[in-house]
C-alpha cells in the first residue's frame, strides 16, 4: 500500500498546480513528465505527503502509543533522513530547525496558522495498516 501511494504521489506531483492544458497534454500514464517550467530534477520523486505518511506508518508499526510528541518525532526523523520539497515555507523551516530528539520544538513551531489544507488528510492513509476499527479510533 505504501509503495503504491508513493508511486501515485510521484506521478501526480507533476500535475499539482499545473494548467488544465498541461494536464490534458501530458497526463497519459506513459511515464513521468517534467513539471511546467522544471528542467531535469523531480521526475519520479515522491513528495512531502508520502514522506509524512512514512512517519505515520513507522509510528503505528512501532507499537508505541500515539501522541503528538511521537508523531512529531517520526515526522522529523522521516524528513531528516531524506529532506525534500513540497512543504510550505513555514513547515519546511520548522522541519529544518528542529531536532528529532526534541520534537516539542517542532510542535511549538507548527501551531495552526489559521489556514486549512488537505495535507493532513493526504498523510492519513497509513492508518489503513491498522486492522481493526476500535484500534483506529483509539489511535
Language model features with spans:
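Structured, active/binding-site neighborhoods that engage oxygen-rich ligands
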Residues: 1-139
Amino acid at each position: 500500500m505504501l509503495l503504491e501511494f508513493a508511486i501515485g504521489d510521484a506521478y501526480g506531483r507533476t500535475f499539482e498546480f499545473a494548467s488544465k492544458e498541461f494536464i490534458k497534454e501530458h497526463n497519459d500514464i506513459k511515464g513521468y513528465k517534467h513539471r511546467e517550467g522544471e528542467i531535469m530534477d523531480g521526475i519520479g520523486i515522491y513528495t512531502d505527503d508520502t514522506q509524512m505518511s512514512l512517519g505515520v506508518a513507522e509510528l503505528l508499526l512501532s507499537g508505541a502509543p500515539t501522541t503528538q510528541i511521537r508523531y512529531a518525532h517520526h515526522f522529523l526523523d522521516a524528513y531528516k533522513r531524506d529532506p525534500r520539497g513540497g512543504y510550505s515555507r513555514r513547515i519546511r523551516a520548522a522541519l529544518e530547525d528542529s531536532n528529532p530528539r526534541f520534537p516539542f520544538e517542532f510542535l511549538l513551531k507548527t501551531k495552526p496558522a489559521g489556514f486549512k489544507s488537505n495535507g493532513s488528510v493526504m498523510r492519513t492513509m497509513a492508518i489503513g495498516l491498522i486492522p481493526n476499527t476500535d484500534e483506529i479510533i483509539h489511535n
